[in-house]
From Swiss-Prot:
The UniProt record lists the keyword Transferase: yes
Disulfide bridges in this chain: none
Organism: Arabidopsis thaliana
Family, per entry: Belongs to the GST superfamily. Theta family.
Protein name as catalogued: Glutathione S-transferase T1
Keywords: Detoxification, Nucleus, Oxidoreductase, Peroxidase, Peroxisome, Transferase
Transmembrane portions of the chain: none
Amino acid sequence: MMKLKVYADRMSQPSRAVIIFCKVNGIQFDEVLISLAKRQQLSPEFKDINPLGKVPAIVDGRLKLFESHAILIYLSSAFPSVADHWYPNDLSKRAKIHSVLDWHHTNLRRGAAGYVLNSVLGPALGLPLNPKAAAEAEQLLTKSLSTLETFWLKGNAKFLLGSNQPSIADLSLVCELMQLQVLDDKDRLRLLSTHKKVEQWIENTKKATMPHFDETHEILFKVKEGFQKRREMGTLSKPGLQSKI
């Protein structure tokens, strides 16, 4: 049987979630780099796998699948080595996980990714910085963090939905928030420091997926260091996007 192939760029939040999930659960796979900076996601070869030209994507036998949440659900169901807590057999628990994942797409992801892209990361991908779009994304991110703090992280549980073990939703959302690492430290702390439950939940998810979590995020940490050096040298524009709108 052919080994699973994962097409990914580790600078992509959902790509990292899929890679970490495979590593934590002992799923053997070949990782194929699709460089977003080089726009390889738009190549004819990759579009044969995902016509939408986005990472991550997988090929498992004859199956070609894209969209990270669909991939995580498929892997949870297809590989016996995956522990039940990632995507429980209990249908009510599954439905609640789906509710978090659906919320994520139009709330936390739009806010976090939009803010990082438009305030810092855009030029690395050939896109201009957009302060207006960044400010709008920051408003959504702030609202989403408050919703995480007060609704999705219930009681004293370590993970989403009152669970004491992580699900695919925890991994997906935490990988999203890790993208904030490329921000200036003061800016990142300004966004996160008032959300103590969120900060602890991020740490809980990291610990539950070590050492694979840090290993998969190494490229992000290197990019963070590069941005910080450029800030110190004065060659990188500061976000300067304190919420005043």
